[in-house]
């Protein structure tokens, strides 16, 4: 680009200095405060009460994983059978939490935990079988000869 043309462009886009309007970068802030306010108003309509001293909440999913909340905020409305649990949830595998949650479970929960463990084991076996199939494919690749540098089939046909 020509230096004179560049200097003219810079002069027309002057930032700062005496008497020039300042250019400001427009920043768009997406506030999560509005979502929190909406949540609080919805909870007030349900007449929920906060429940204190809950250290952790575990939600078991059908695929064998667990949504784990450590130190969540819990609000409950017993008459409407509504519980609000919010905080930072982490998606963890069942095996990570098993030793710590066994003493917290009742007899009915232990039965459901056994079912989850069985489904988890079957999922792991399926993954293992898929891995075995992939290993078998690697064995089939051993039949294919490797290319060697320097060997040229065209030169061999010309010699014969």
Curated annotation (Swiss-Prot):
Annotated disulfide bonds: none
- Residue ranges that the Swiss-Prot or TrEMBL entry lists as coiled coil: none
Please provide the record's keywords in A-Z order.
Cytoplasm, Nucleus, Protein transport, Repressor, Transcription, Transcription regulation, Transport
**What spans are recorded as compositionally biased (Basic and acidic residues)?**
124-134
Could you name the domain of life of the organism this protein comes from? Eukaryota
Please list the residue ranges annotated as the NAC-A/B domain. Answer: 33-98
Name where it mostly resides.
cytoplasm
GO cellular component terms, semicolon-separated? cytosol; nascent polypeptide-associated complex; nucleus
Region of interest (Disordered), residue spans: 16-36, 118-160
**Where is this chain's protein located in or outside the cell?**
Cytoplasm; Nucleus
- Composition bias, kind Basic residues: at what positions? 20-30
Note the InterPro entries from the entry: BTF3, NAC_A/B_dom_sf, Nas_poly-pep-assoc_cplx_dom
Which purpose does this protein serve, as stated in its record? Answer: Component of the nascent polypeptide-associated complex (NAC), a dynamic component of the ribosomal exit tunnel, protecting the emerging polypeptides from interaction with other cytoplasmic proteins to ensure appropriate nascent protein targeting. The NAC complex also promotes mitochondrial protein import by enhancing productive ribosome interactions with the outer mitochondrial membrane and blocks the inappropriate interaction of ribosomes translating non-secretory nascent polypeptides with translocation sites in the membrane of the endoplasmic reticulum.
Hey, which family's this protein in? Answer: Belongs to the NAC-beta family.
Q: How does it assemble?
A: Part of the nascent polypeptide-associated complex (NAC), consisting of EGD2 and EGD1. NAC associates with ribosomes via EGD1.
Q: What is this protein called?
A: Nascent polypeptide-associated complex subunit beta
Q: Which gene encodes it?
A: EGD1
